[in-house]
C-alpha cells in the first residue's frame, strides 16, 4: 500500500518523522505493542498503519491515544474540526483505509496509562501535551510501561532549544545524557 500521509486529507502537516515510524515498524516483532500519545488528525498514525500493513505485521497492537479535543498550548482550539466537535470523526475518516491496523483510545494519556501494565509496551511515542508539566507527566506515567529493550520517544524536540523549549527541558531533565535526538525533531530513549 502506498503512503498517504502527505495527502491533502490531513490539511496540516505535523508528521516530520515518517522514517522514524518506518524504522519502528521494521523493528517491532509481530504481536508487539506500540502506543502513540497524541494522534490529532492521524497523519503519523497513517505512516505506522501503512508500514504494518506492508510488512504484514497483522498482530502488532497499535494504540492511538487522544481526547480529540485539542489543547490550548498548540493553538488547536481554533481548528475548524474542534470547533465543530468533529475532530475524532476527521481522524477516523483520514484512517479509513487502514482501520484494521490501529486501536483508538479516546481518553487522556493518564487514563490510557491505566490500561497498560508495566513492561507491556515495545514503543511509546509522546506527542500530546507540549507543556513542560504535560511532557514530564507523560514521561513519568509511561516510562515504566516500556519493556526492557523497548523505546520511549517523542516529537517536537529541538536540541538547540529554539522551539518547543518546554519539551526539551522536560525530556532532558528526565533522561539527561540518555536522550538521543533523532531526525524529524524527535527524541528517543532505549530502556
Describe the function of each predicted region.
Residues 2-191:
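S-adenosylmethionine/decaboxylated-SAM
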Amino acid at each position: 500500500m502506498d503512503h498517504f500521509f502527505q495527502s491533502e486529507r490531513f490539511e496540516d502537516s505535523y508528521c516530520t518523522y515518517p522514517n522514524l515510524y518506518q524504522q519502528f515498524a521494521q523493528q517491532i516483532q509481530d504481536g508487539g505493542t506500540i502506543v502513540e500519545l497524541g494522534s490529532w488528525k492521524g497523519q503519523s498514525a497513517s505512516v505506522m498503519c501503512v508500514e504494518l500493513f506492508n510488512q504484514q505485521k497483522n498482530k502488532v497492537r497499535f494504540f492511538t491515544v487522544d481526547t480529540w479535543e485539542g489543547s490550548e498550548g498548540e493553538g488547536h482550539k481554533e481548528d475548524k474540526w474542534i470547533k465543530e466537535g468533529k475532530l475524532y470523526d476527521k481522524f477516523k475518516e483520514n484512517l479509513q483505509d487502514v482501520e484494521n491496523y490501529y486501536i483508538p483510545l479516546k481518553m487522556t494519556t493518564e487514563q490510557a496509562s491505566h490500561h497498560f501494565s508495566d513492561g507491556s509496551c515495545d514503543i511509546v511515542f509522546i506527542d500530546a501535551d507540549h507543556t513542560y508539566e504535560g511532557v514530564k507527566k507523560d514521561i513519568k506515567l509511561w516510562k515504566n510501561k516500556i519493556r526492557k529493550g523497548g523505546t520511549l520517544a517523542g516529537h517536537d524536540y529541538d536540541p538547540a532549544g529554539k522551539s518547543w523549549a518546554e519539551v526539551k527541558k522536560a525530556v532532558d531533565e528526565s533522561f539527561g545524557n540518555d536522550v538521543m535526538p533523532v531526525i524529524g525533531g524527535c527524541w528517543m530513549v532505549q530502556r
